[in-house]
Amino acid sequence: MRLDHWIKQFFIVPGIICAALLAKENFVPENFFANIFEGFIATCLIASANYVINEYLDAEFDKHHPTKKFRAAVKETMSGKIIFLLWLALTILGLSIAALVNKYFFAMTAWLWLMGIFYNVKPIRTKDIAYLDVLTESVNNMIRLLMGWFIIIKALTPPRAVSYSAIGCSAHF
């Protein structure tokens, strides 16, 4: 589940800050802290689902990597059925919690999950395509920023300035 990588999910914080500072209407103060907590947990669970499938699909290749070869997913034989059930459970739980926040946050969470599929699973597997691998990971940062926005705001689109900074954020990572 790569809990050590949950720190990356803090990329939702700039979106939360932008939403809190720029929102005049559609602000959700009554659920402010609950939405942030649920949003962060949902984001971490979806990221974990993506890491689980990544670790499983890359285990054979990672055996030859100088540092990745020491990971448990590489050193131990994993049952495909158990991995699939863990991935499915993390996905369902993450998306279910995301749905508690609001429909826009749910859509962004589903998009982050889908990007994990595109990145890891054939026939697309952008991880194996030069430039698309980095682009896919960069788009994930934009998605996280938008997830932060939608944790706070129940509006279809953030202001253009936030949208442009999300694109810039994505281009620089």
Describe each region flagged by the PLM.
Residues 2-8, 72-84, 119-142:
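Interhelical loop and helix-boundary elements at the membrane-water interface
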Residues 1-59, 63, 76-89:
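Topogenic membrane-insertion module of multi-pass membrane proteins
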Residues 17-41, 93-107, 145-167:
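Helix-coil boundary and interhelical linker segments in multi-pass alpha-helical membrane proteins
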Residues 44-56, 113-123, 142-146, 164-173:
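Transmembrane alpha-helical segments that form the membrane-embedded catalytic/substrate-channel core
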Residues 59, 64-110, 159-169:
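Multi-pass membrane catalytic core of lipid/isoprenoid biosynthesis enzymes
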Residues 7-14, 37, 41, 45, ...:
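Lipid-exposed faces of alpha-helical membrane segments in multi-pass integral membrane proteins
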Residues 27-35, 68, 79, 101, ...:
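Membrane-helix interfacial "entry" motifs
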Residues 43-74, 123-136, 173:
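Acidic (Asp/Glu-rich) catalytic motifs at the cytosolic membrane interface
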